Amino acid sequence: MRPLFAAGQYPHGGMIRPLIRANRFPALRKCQNICGLIASPPFASTGISVDFKRTQGESTCDRPRGGENAYTAPIMDKLDFTFIHAPATYDFRERSIMYGPVSDMVPSTPIFEMYPLGLTTLCEYFERNGFRARIYNLASMMLHKKNFDVEKNLARLESRMFGIDLHWMPHCHGSIEVAKILKRLHPHVPISFGGLSSSIFHEDLIAYDCIDYVFRGDSTEEPMRMLVERVVRAQKTGTPVGDLSDIPNLTWKDKTGRVHINPLSWVPDDMNAISMDYDYPMKGVLRQLDFTSYLPMKGWLQYPVTASLTCRGCARNCATCGGSAYAFKNHFGRRKVAWRDPKLLIRDIEHVQNHVWGPIFVLNDFLQAGPAYTEQFICGLKGKVQNPIGFEFFGPPPGGNDFYNMLDANLKSWSVEISAESHDDDVRSAFGKGHYKMAELEDTIVEALSHPNCDRFDLYFMTGIPKQTAASVRETGAYVQHLYERVNYDPRLVVMTSPMAPFLDVGSIAFDNPEHYGYKLRARTFEEHRQRMILPSWKHIMNYESDYMSVDEMVDATYDAALDINRIKGEHGILDPAMSAAVDKRVREAREQMNRLDDVLYNGTGRIDTRMAALKEEFERLSENTVAEKSELNLAFNIKPTHALHLAKLGVSNVPANLANRLTGTWRSAASEFAYPPQKNGVQAPAWNPDGTPNCTFKGVVTDGMGDGRLLANDAGEQVAAFGSVVAPGFARENTNAAFDAENAELEAGRAGTDAVVGDACAIPAAQRGSVMRDPLLEQMMAEEAERTEHHGPLSAGGLKGAAGRAGARDARKLNKLRRREQ
């Protein structure tokens, strides 16, 4: 399981799932987001041309860092930084791809238009430091506007820098294609990448001509501010950016094209310097008068889900998770979890629910922080939560009934989510979840549902994990039947399953050591992953094959398990009969379509894309809600008068001032109304030894999780939680995952003295990198891509009006004009 908004990289099994069903109040829903009421033509813009004019002698760092932050300055010509969120596959509107169930367990569509929460924290951090920043959700724009011309709209953006997130690996195709277009349209504007996947593939990315900078690590607010300050100063003064070797976590090119990899040394100890109160996106929409480009995902207005993050990092070590303790230690330089102060977490929740009435999900199991943190957080919520609230846990909460009694005593309603991955304890142990047994999980489900304030308990399974066979997957239905019998078919228990797709997480233990965990990789480098994103279906796109079941067996077993679970829920009233019948029909149609696809691919002649074109409409219909209805996971919520009042107050306090600023030529910051301190580096052992070699020997000390974060160590001060499964201090639970931890410790030790690449926290030995499986279908499609590009140019993503030839000619003319100016 991976938290979609937070540490884990891939959105196929994360905490933020579509748990909400918006009540149908058309009149009230009109004011669901006051921003939407004013974000309509002719006021909506794709990128307003504004700039700060510095007062003589003023430093960017001297600008307000907190409070009202209503700093205004004369408008000049452009934004300082624009974050662009690309679709997973850039030209998805032209291609025929059967995405299948890859996004069934998350709120977004298969193009993963939901941008990471980190974009909002970065923008807010920039704004409180005096820079102008905005989010431009290109994927959302492409989904919402059928005729949206990508290149035309990107050409209108005016910014001193562009940033593209590559946090979740499925964006590997779209992010690069958008970067190429931006560099064509704005050849002198630097482009930076960031996110967990960017951190892992920073050397691959910096090799692209269209990328100038790559940031590594999970907390780059301050390093990025340092770079933005240099770039803005250089552009305003007409001087070179200069040497950037003092900016931590940065991979960059100098003016000669030489690549530099700065130390991965910026790793804050806590999450207290960033804003998680949603002030920035709400104020940003009102300021830009542009709602669609800020929209988190398709359907958000009817489904306004929000998240509160407890931490960055993890004390657990699931084998296939790119957000595990192993991944954070070896790829992101983090030796301990960075916790958010529970008081700030409570304030975040209070502030969000003032303006958004959808459910709030608390991500990243806060029980890892220990009992003191847990008690302060839960008790602090008493009387303050009016929205539905859900908690993600990585296992049965210690204390059982006592813990649920505490939830009942402080919250009027609450929900729980746990991803067990498999009903088979042996499979779960191989995955890294041997610290509890399914019998314990069953007990905690019964205990939770016995409490009157428990709204629901969501349980998730996943196919494709280590040592899992097709037979084991098909046994899931029988286990679910047993589980429902035990809770007397309580409809508050919601069970779902989905595949580990499209990718095995890069940076995970299993990705770095595939043979050890029973995998063969179809892709290892960034470019190999990028190429796979245009393949015809989710089973072809996958970057791995398991030794325990073939890809075809996995697809069939996934559909079988989904059919069984759906049938059980339909027969016993857990799911509406009509909805159950619709899901059953769609799963069977999806399976039939996959068989038809195989027939077209392997028995047809001619170009693959031509053969696939006839299937596009059916692919699109069957690539959402494939194995389940998203609405099945929806929690009912109510709109309260206080929501409308707070929205009205937000509009009154911002809209007139923003309009006045536009008329007078000034800029109004969208920074949070709360004061936050500057981000500071952590005091943990550095990621680098004095001689420049990676430091992989750090041992922590025990702490209770308050203030300075939960160190990954046991009572003896030995670093064991970096290999996963120790329980937070204060909770007496046996570590039943010792064998799994020992195996990973052995793998970790085997990395010492290997051919470490400068800049990697701990490099993968060359012997482990190996070669990937040969894929004839991919080879044929890439040959066809090359032939088509040579004769006709690349596919256009400009919508119905975006002919590639015309756009390419226009771009060439613009580029030639810019070059003539330089000469």
Identify what each model region corresponds to.
Residues 5, 9, 70-83, 132, ...:
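Radical SAM enzyme core and accessory elements
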Residues 76-81, 92-97, 247, 253-310:
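N-terminal [4Fe-4S]-dependent radical SAM core
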Residues 79-84, 163, 192, 341-456, ...:
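Conserved SAM/AdoMet-binding glycine-rich loop
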Residues 81-111:
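Short glycine-rich His-centered loop
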Residues 91-93, 201-202, 316, 328-329, ...:
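Flexible glycine/acidic-rich beta-alpha junction loops that bind and position SAM and/or redox cofactors
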Residues 118, 125, 134-270, 506:
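Glycine-rich beta-alpha loop elements in corrinoid/cobalamin-binding modules
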Residues 204-207, 467-482:
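Catalytic cores of alpha/beta
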Residues 298-341:
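Canonical Radical SAM [4Fe-4S] cluster-binding loop centered on the CxxxCxxC motif
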